Amino acid sequence: MSREKPSVLIFSEMFPKPKSSSSGVFIVERLKALGNLGLPFDFAPVSTFDSLPIRILKKLKGYSPSVPIESVQVNQKHYPVLNVSLGLRDRIGLIKQEPSSWMKYAQGMASAIEKNKNIEEYRLIHAHRVFPEGYAAMRLSQKYSIPYIVTAHGGEIHSLSYDFHTLVREILRNASRAIFVSNALMKDACEKLGYDKSNGIVIPNGVDTNVFKPMDKEEARRKLSLPLDKKIVGFVGNLIEVKGADRLPAIARELLKLRSDVFFFIVGDGPLLKTLREKMPGDISHFAGRLEYGLMPMAMNSIDVLVVPSRNEGFPATILEARACGAWVIGTEAGGVAEAIDSDGIGGIVGEDIEKSLSEAINSSLEKGLHLASSTRRSKIPSWEDTIEEEAKVYWGCME
């Protein structure tokens, strides 16, 4: 087979954007590792950009408007972003989670890819997310008789509207293989959607341990203007309820009952920002907003503990990033949180008073002064190379 001609067409709406360089970075990291492995592929980043009315509406709802981007760079190559044109009503419909608007978006993805790519050149289509990307992949597969696979990342399974249950089950069943980033997510698909997992496989996210690695904690804190004499609890993610951001004030209050030397470093943006600023107790927190992805290794090195109070998750890459930098991780039972934490923290925390339980676990880890920078522990953390080696096996199996 010619190495110059791509065999696999990979596409997704998730990729780094100007105001959110961490968004979809797990897709780009996969592509980098795939390129290093030598398997020929093409990438189609797809998106719909915000008009002026949509930018205003997003700001009113506490969301950051998107900024148009022309291409996504992977290694030394630039892949043009394919724009899905939607009317104002449907753009508002996406924000309001209206099923008809999301179906138009999914159909628009298929049309944009078909218009800009010679589909018949490929031997396999890989959609990252079961919906809406997976629906576009299924349509293209049926039209061109090319197999497709999907990767379920989380939200399209655990937070899926009931209106899409039948459709998403169909997308999963018709795929040559359905990849899930955690065992918990595949179990959720089985229980929630009636998926039979006959074509399912679990391949977790990885982390670049050459980038996320231990560095001097004091230096990291100085550069980020964080206190040197405190135990720092980090939160990284969108400031929304599904990520458990609303639980942070109660966690902080409970933790202050146990110790006075704590400080919260909150990285992320979202509709709960104003509320969190008002409710976090005292002067014990710093809201960093969205950090450039290049600063994330420093951020992870600045903290003692990462707290993951999520209500739903797939397989949080932030947990692996924190572990690779030597931080302890405390999290709920949501999705693949416990799988991602492994033995480098405490996962699976449940209970009616979840905030108190999380604060007690945080305090316990701080009391022990745990730091996980040893090479033995870091060697157990999955890398992107590990992830892609498994995905490549799936590719070849589907193209035989």
Residue ranges and their predicted role:
Residues 274-291:
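Nucleotide-activated donor-binding/catalytic signature segment of Leloir-type glycosyltransferases, i.e.
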Residues 343-355, 364-369:
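Conserved acidic donor-binding segment of nucleotide-sugar-dependent glycosyltransferases
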Residues 290, 298-303:
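Short alpha-helical donor nucleotide-sugar binding micro-motif in glycosyltransferases
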Residues 184, 206:
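Carbohydrate-associated surface elements
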Residues 370-399:
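A charged, aromatic-enriched C-terminal amphipathic alpha-helix characteristic of glycosyltransferases
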Residues 9, 227-243, 249-252:
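Conserved donor-binding/catalytic core segment of Leloir-type glycosyltransferases
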Residues 311:
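Aromatic "clamp/platform" in nucleotide-sugar-dependent glycosyltransferases that forms part
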Residues 328-331:
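Short hydrophobic beta-strand element within catalytic cores of glycosyltransferases
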